[in-house]
Amino acid sequence: MRYNQFSYIPTSLERAAEELKELGFDLDLQKTAKANLESFLRKLFFHYPDSDYPLSHLIAKNDMDALSFFQSEQELSKEVFDLLALQVLGFIPGVDFTEADAFLDKLAFPIHFDETEIIKHIHHLLATRCKSGMTLIDDLVSQGMLTMDNDYHFFNGKSLATFDTSQLIREVVYVEAPLDTDQDGQLDLIKVNIIRPQSQKPLPTLMTPSPYHQGINEVANDKKLYRMEKELVVKKRRQITVEDRDFIPLETQPCKLPIGQNLESFSYINSYSLNDYFLARGFANIYVSGVGTAGSTGFMTSGDYAQIESFKAVIDWLNGRATAYTSHSKTHQVRADWANGLVCTTGKSYLGTMSTGLATTGVDGLAMIIAESAISSWYNYYRENGLVCSPGGYPGEDLDVLTELTYSRNLLAGDYLRHNDRYQELLNQQSQALDRQSGDYNQFWHDRNYLKNAHQIKCDVVYTHGLQDWNVKPRQVYEIVNALPSTINKHLFLHQGEHVYMHNWQSIDFRESMNALLCQKLLGLANDFSLPEMIWQDNTCPQNWQERKVFGTSTIKELDLGQELLLIDNHYGEDEFKAYGKDFRAFKAALFKGKANQALVDILLEEDLLINGEIVLQLKVKSSENKGLLSAQILDYGKKKRLGDLPIALTQSSIDNGQNFSREPLKELPFRENSYRVISKGFMNLQNRNNLSSIETIPNNKWMTVRLPLQPTIYHLEKGDTLRVILYTTDFEHTVRDNSNYALTIDLSQSQLIVPIASN
């Protein structure tokens, strides 16, 4: 374990003493440091009628227990404080450590003993994470140190778990959206699942916009998947044009219906544990799946601003600008009289994507988004540089396949009976519009590109993204964070994992940082919390996070690739082609072992290199035919210890998100020896070699200059490391699988790897 503490708010002595008193700690500025520490420790054992017993189970020195120490005349020292602090946080002498000083250095322990600062040290200790993954104060509240009185209690600028999660209100409303996506002449209704604590105060809301939450249709999804085996189409030379089109919602009328009290209820919904954490701290949770999902009406428009509007309507309802009904019969309306109108959206992948789309509408009431692994341009999710390009791990998927997966209305047999024919018509229109044949950018994709509206974002934004995420690739977050207005508060966490959540990792206090931010933005708490704009997980060692200023630098270093002419054959034998098509993982294994059709260039680094931004391959290329696709991957190659990309569970249920509520495991990325790590990758149709909107011909056996931008990253390589460049054609995980007999030739003498670099 290593501390990377970003959530602690430095506090004055007076404020620290006041907050400790509010929690019931009987500390006195006039007492000695030793007396105050003893009083603090005894309070921790509030379950015991006699605190001597648990105090005797701690040691103050290697040869003295804590009870004996406090009964003695010995003075409090750094050695004693450190040893007791470690034990209070759950670290066991002789098990987790033998030498406290060395262990504290390894932990990067954030508290440095000064006898005159004991009150502030105790305050800081309470806000510091235990071995279990919870802060000490959260652990104490979890055990019942504070009663669940359904009111707010704060410590160090963060809300504590004092809302009763055993008496939650669970209700359903149906919000009227200014849409008619299935063109049936009726405004679409959007089902909203609400979970909120009982409280006399207006509550802020965490909203998870999740098209998955009302169920998914995996059977329809699998039937809709596309075969990747097809020839790369030779496209006609042309220029692509698109236009920015404002989304125009339909008109709605003020509702004059009576207020209903008898709301639909529910017992369970698959919740997001970060939401659960805030539910226990006085934040309502709502789950919304949007148009075309079970319980709602309309068509699943998948990614456009009509879908975004169906979520926006819910924020409008929370602020009194839209109507919600108690049921589909629309006999009574219901108002969000429990809400304070301020909303933060949460969720990963599609969920985070909807958060970005919502933010670009500038809707009033949306105070903040926490968008994890989020898409900012749907074209860049299903296409790349004029190619059909599947997200990592999902060859054959496309946006209409995702529509089939998430159109959960068809999971309700009655809805299927009444609406499936119309749904199939609209789905066919969507399949035509996305133009899988060419892989080109068009108006359909432009209407699903949130980057063009990034200037309209006015809420605070928090993004998290894995630099090993080949599903929602790093370019998605790179482009949105660099398009954000300079006037807003923005925060980016870049981790070394893949397509994963990070709120329950041991090495970063993400959960507590979000608590401080949300208390600021949604509860109006003046806590003086300041979070860096960007926090990056160092790839060279375990559990080390650093502040960075920017994602993407303008300083570059050009690395020569050699002097040879390299030939890349596209064609595979029939058996090999079928085997790779059947299992793309077998292809990846062969590729990284140098056994696929590929060209390899190894670059031995003569100095440290901190990559920050978009690596570009500038290549001199020719194709034996009038077509060609180019794939590239950059590896950190050679045996050494590296971070894994999937977090593993360190404990099973050590994190309590309330008071015995929604427990979850503590996780972390492992640090193990392996043979390589992918730094970046990229794909291009050579007919789109200059830009996305220009389709050009490929002259047979004529040299072309190609600039292939790879996925942005921040990655630290050290002197003596090997940077491996892999150039090839068909990628069996991502691209179409064209087995035609053509070859690419690369002139390395006129090719470079252009690397954006930053100082370390």
Curated annotation (Swiss-Prot):
It catalyses: Hydrolyzes Xaa-Pro-|- bonds to release unblocked, N-terminal dipeptides from substrates including Ala-Pro-|-p-nitroanilide and (sequentially) Tyr-Pro-|-Phe-Pro-|-Gly-Pro-|-Ile. Its EC number is 3.4.14.11. The keyword Cytoplasm applies. Keywords: Aminopeptidase, Cytoplasm, Hydrolase, Protease, Serine protease. The keyword Zinc-finger does not apply. The active site is at S349 (charge relay system), D469 (charge relay system), H499 (charge relay system). One of its GO terms (molecular function) is serine-type peptidase activity. GO terms for cellular component: cytoplasm. It holds the Pfam family PepX_C. It is found in: Cytoplasm. It comes from the Bacteria. One of its GO terms (biological process) is proteolysis. Belongs to the peptidase S15 family. Homodimer. Removes N-terminal dipeptides sequentially from polypeptides having unsubstituted N-termini provided that the penultimate residue is proline. PANTHER family: COCE_NOND FAMILY, PUTATIVE (AFU_ORTHOLOGUE AFUA_7G00600)-RELATED (PTHR43056:SF10), PEPTIDASE S9 PROLYL OLIGOPEPTIDASE (PTHR43056). NCBIfam families: PRK05371.1-4. This is Xaa-Pro dipeptidyl-peptidase. It comes from Streptococcus pyogenes serotype M3 (strain ATCC BAA-595 / MGAS315). The gene is pepX.
